[in-house]
C-alpha cells in the first residue's frame, strides 16, 4: 500500500498539502503525549499539512479525516517518515442506504431470561456524552426542552446541566462536557469520568457526529468499557445523506454490540426512537455486548494477552473499588496513575503489572500508551471500513474553505480581524446601540417627568421625592441607558462565535498572545470583556489550562468595558472637550497596553515557574470551527 522513504523529518517542516507522510515517533510526555495519542497521532497514522497560521504558528494538519491545530513547538516532537507514492484508496461498502428498523429490538443482545428490569417508578438517569461540536447540547435541548446556550466554540458546555426527558416520567439526563477521551488530564474529562464512575447513571447516551465517525468512536470505545447500558446516537445523518454518504446502521450495531440510532438533532429527526431505545436499555440494564476490541491474533496478540492478564490480576481490586474491570485494565495498560491509586495494589501486584505491560511493549514494538491507542484506532478503522461510506465534500465545506483563505490568510487575516471588530464596535457604539440608547434615554426622561409631576402634585415628602427621582430614575436610569449597547455588542459577538469566526481568530492570534503567556483561545474572553468584564471573566472557564484561566481572569478587567464609558465620557468632556474622540481611543488602547505590560510582569513573578505545557489538542469539524488549544 505504501512506499516509505528511509529519510525522516519533523512534521513542522512539511510544506502545504505535502504528500501523505506517516508518523514514526510521537514525543512529549504526560498529558501532552497522551492527548497526542488520543487524537490519533500514533505511529503509522497518515497526516497531511493543511495550512500555517498567518504568523507561521500554529499549523493545521489533517489526520483520520479531520483537522487538528498544533503549535510548532509541539509538532516538532513528532517525527515522520515521508511517503511520496499515492495512498491506495480503501474499499468502501455499498453506498445503498439501509433504513434502520423501528423500535422493537428489545433484548437483541442479551438473553431475555437473564434480564432483570428495574422496579417500576425507579429513576432512570442518563449521561449525555460526546465530543465537542457534535450537536450534544442541541440534542439535550430536544430531549429536555430546556433553553441552553448552543455555541460553536469548543468547550461551550462547562457546567453540568440536568433535565427530565420530555414525555418520560422518572427520567433525568445530564449534559456532560464535550470531551475526546476519558484520560484524566483536563477538567472536562475528569468531570465526565467521575460522573459515570461515581454517580452510576442507569444509561449513557453517546452522541456521535456521523460526518466524522472515525474521530468520535474513540470515546465510544472507552464508554463501552465502563459496562454501563448505552445507546449510540448518530447525529447529523441528514448531512451525510445529502452529500452522498451512508452508514450501514445494522452492521455497526452488530460490530459494537449496542443500539445505534440515526438522528438529526437540529431537525428533530429520530429523537423519539432514540428515547425509546435509551429508556429500554436503562430499564432492562442491557449492557454493551462487546468490550474486547482486539483479537487474539492482532499484531501477535500482545495487547490482547496483556489486557486479559491485567484483568485477571486486578479483578478483586476493581470490584472493591467499584471500577469496571475492563476499563481499569485498559487504563492501567496505558499508564493511568489515578486508576492505579484507586485500585490500591500491593507492591508484588504492581511489579507483576509492570512486567505484563513491559512484555506487551516489547512484543508490540510500541510504548504502553501508543499500543492501547493503536489498538483502539485499528478497531475503529475496521468498523468504519465495513459500515461507513464517507460523504463527498459538501458545498458548505467548499465555501467555508474559500472563506478561510481570506479570514486566515497570511496577508488578509489581521486586516479582516481589524475590519470586522471595527465594524462591530462602530455599529454598536455609533449606529444600532447608540440609536437604541437614545430611544431608551428619551423614554426614561419622559417617564421621569411624568412621575416627577405626579409626585409634586400629590405633595409627596421632599425626601421621598428626591429618593425616587434622583436616586431611582436618574441613578438607575443612567445605568439602564447603557443596556442597549451591551445587548447589541453581545449580539454581534454571539454571531461571530456561532459562525466559527471566534475560533479562527484564536487560530490567527495564538502566536501573538503566547508572547505574553496566553493562548489564542484567550482572545474570546478578552473580546467579551470589551462589552462587560463579568461575562468576559466567566468565558475564561472554557480555557483548558489553569494558568491560562488565571492570567485571562486577571487581565480581562483591563479591557475597557461599556460600564467605563460614562466615566471616560465625563472626564474627556470635562478636561479634553476638543479632543474627546482621540482621548477615548487612547484610553481604550491604554487599557490594552497595560494588560500586555501586566501579563509580561506576571510571567516573571506571579506565574513564574508554573507549568506552561501545551494543553489539550482539539479537533475541528472541517465545515465548522477551528479549535486551537
For the regions a protein language model found, what residue spans apply to each?
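Transmembrane helix-loop junctions at the membrane interface of multipass transporters and ion channels
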Residues: 558, 562-585, 603-604
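Alpha-helical membrane segments and immediately flanking helix-loop junctions
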Residues: 517-565, 572
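Membrane-embedded alpha-helical segments and adjacent helix-loop junctions characteristic
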Residues: 428-525, 616, 620-625
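Conserved G1/Walker A P-loop phosphate-binding module
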Residues: 102-181
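Conserved C-terminal guanine-recognition region of P-loop GTPase G domains, centered on the G4
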Residues: 193-259
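Interfacial loop/helix-cap signal at membrane boundaries in integral membrane proteins
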Residues: 355-389, 394-404, 438-480
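Short, small-residue-biased leader/transition segments that mark boundaries at the very start
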Residues: 6-20, 617-628
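Canonical P-loop GTPase G-domain recognition
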Residues: 240-292
Amino acid at each position: 500500500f505504501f512506499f516509505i522513504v528511509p529519510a525522516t523529518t519533523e512534521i513542522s517542516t512539511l510544506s502545504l498539502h505535502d504528500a501523505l507522510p506517516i508518523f514514526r515517533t510521537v514525543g512529549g510526555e504526560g498529558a501532552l503525549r497522551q492527548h497526542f495519542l488520543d487524537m490519533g497521532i500514533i505511529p503509522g497514522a497518515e497526516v497531511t499539512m493543511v495550512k500555517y497560521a498567518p504568523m507561521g504558528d500554529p499549523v493545521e494538519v489533517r489526520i483520520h479525516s479531520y483537522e487538528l491545530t498544533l503549535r510548532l513547538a509541539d509538532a516538532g516532537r513528532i517525527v515522520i517518515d515521508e511517503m511520496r507514492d499515492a495512498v491506495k484508496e480503501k474499499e468502501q461498502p455499498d453506498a445503498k442506504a439501509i433504513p434502520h428498523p423501528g423500535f422493537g429490538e428489545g433484548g437483541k443482545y442479551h438473553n431475555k431470561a437473564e434480564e432483570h428490569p428495574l422496579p417500576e417508578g425507579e429513576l432512570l438517569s442518563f449521561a449525555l456524552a460526546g465530543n465537542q461540536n457534535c450537536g450534544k447540547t442541541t440534542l439535550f435541548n430536544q430531549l429536555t426542552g430546556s433553553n441552553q446556550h448552543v455555541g460553536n466554540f469548543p468547550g461551550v458546555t462547562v457546567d453540568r446541566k440536568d433535565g427530565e426527558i420530555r414525555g418520560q416520567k422518572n427520567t433525568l439526563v445530564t449534559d456532560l462536557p464535550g470531551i475526546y477521551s476519558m484520560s484524566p488530564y483536563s477538567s472536562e474529562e475528569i468531570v465526565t469520568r467521575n460522573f459515570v464512575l461515581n454517580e452510576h447513571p442507569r444509561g449513557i447516551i453517546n452522541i456521535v457526529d456521523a460526518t466524522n465517525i472515525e474521530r468520535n468512536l474513540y470515546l465510544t470505545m472507552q464508554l463501552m468499557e465502563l459496562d454501563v447500558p448505552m445507546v449510540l446516537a448518530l447525529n447529523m445523518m441528514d448531512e451525510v445523506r445529502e452529500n452522498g454518504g451512508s452508514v450501514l446502521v445494522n452492521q455497526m450495531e452488530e460490530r459494537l454490540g449496542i443500539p445505534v440510532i440515526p438522528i438529526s438533532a437540529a431537525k428533530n429527526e429520530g429523537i423519539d426512537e432514540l428515547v425509546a431505545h435509551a429508556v429500554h436499555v436503562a430499564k432492562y440494564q442491557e449492557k454493551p455486548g462487546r468490550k474486547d476490541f482486539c483479537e487474539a491474533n492482532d499484531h501477535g496478540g500482545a495487547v490482547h494477552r496483556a489486557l486479559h492478564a491485567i484483568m485477571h490480576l486486578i479483578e478483586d481490586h476493581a470490584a472493591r473499588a467499584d471500577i469496571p474491570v475492563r476499563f481499569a485494565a485498559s487504563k492501567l495498560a496505558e499508564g493511568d496513575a489515578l486508576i492505579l491509586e484507586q485500585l490500591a495494589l500491593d507492591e508484588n501486584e504492581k511489579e507483576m503489572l509492570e512486567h505484563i505491560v513491559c512484555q506487551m511493549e516489547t512484543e508490540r514494538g510500541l510504548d504502553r500508551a501508543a499500543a492501547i491507542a493503536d489498538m483502539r484506532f485499528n478497531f475503529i478503522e475496521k468498523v468504519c471500513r465495513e459500515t461507513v461510506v464517507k460523504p463527498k465534500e459538501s458545498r458548505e465545506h467548499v465555501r467555508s474553505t474559500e472563506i478561510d483563505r481570506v479570514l486566515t490568510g497570511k496577508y488578509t487575516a489581521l486586516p479582516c480581524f481589524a475590519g470586522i471588530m471595527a465594524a462591530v464596535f462602530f455599529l454598536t457604539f455609533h449606529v444600532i446601540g447608540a440609536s437604541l440608547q437614545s430611544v431608551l434615554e428619551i423614554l426614561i426622561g419622559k417617564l421621569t417627568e411624568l412621575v416627577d409631576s405626579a409626585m409634586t402634585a400629590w405633595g409627596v415628602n421632599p425626601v421621598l421625592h428626591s429618593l425616587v427621582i434622583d436616586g431611582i430614575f436618574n441613578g438607575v436610569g443612567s445605568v439602564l441607558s447603557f443596556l442597549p449597547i451591551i445587548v447589541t455588542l453581545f449580539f454581534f459577538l454571539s454571531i461571530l462565535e456561532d459562525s466559527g469566526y471566534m475560533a479562527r481568530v484564536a487560530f490567527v492570534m495564538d502566536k501573538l498572545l503566547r508572547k505574553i503567556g496566553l493562548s489564542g483561545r484567550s482572545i474570546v474572553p478578552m473580546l467579551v470583556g470589551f462589552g462587560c468584564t463579568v461575562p468576559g471573566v466567566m468565558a475564561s472557564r472554557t480555557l483548558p489550562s489553569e494558568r491560562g484561566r488565571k492570567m485571562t481572569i486577571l487581565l480581562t478587567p483591563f479591557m475597557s468595558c461599556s460600564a467605563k464609558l460614562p466615566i471616560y465620557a465625563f472626564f474627556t468632556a470635562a478636561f479634553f472637550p476638543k479632543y474627546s474622540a482621540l482621548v477615548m481611543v487612547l484610553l481604550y488602547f491604554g487599557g490594552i497596553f497595560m494588560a500586555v505590560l501586566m501579563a509580561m510582569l506576571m510571567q516573571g513573578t506571579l506565574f513564574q515557574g508554573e507549568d506552561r505545557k501545551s494543553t489539550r489538542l482539539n479537533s475541528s469539524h472541517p465545515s465548522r470551527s477551528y479549535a486551537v488549544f
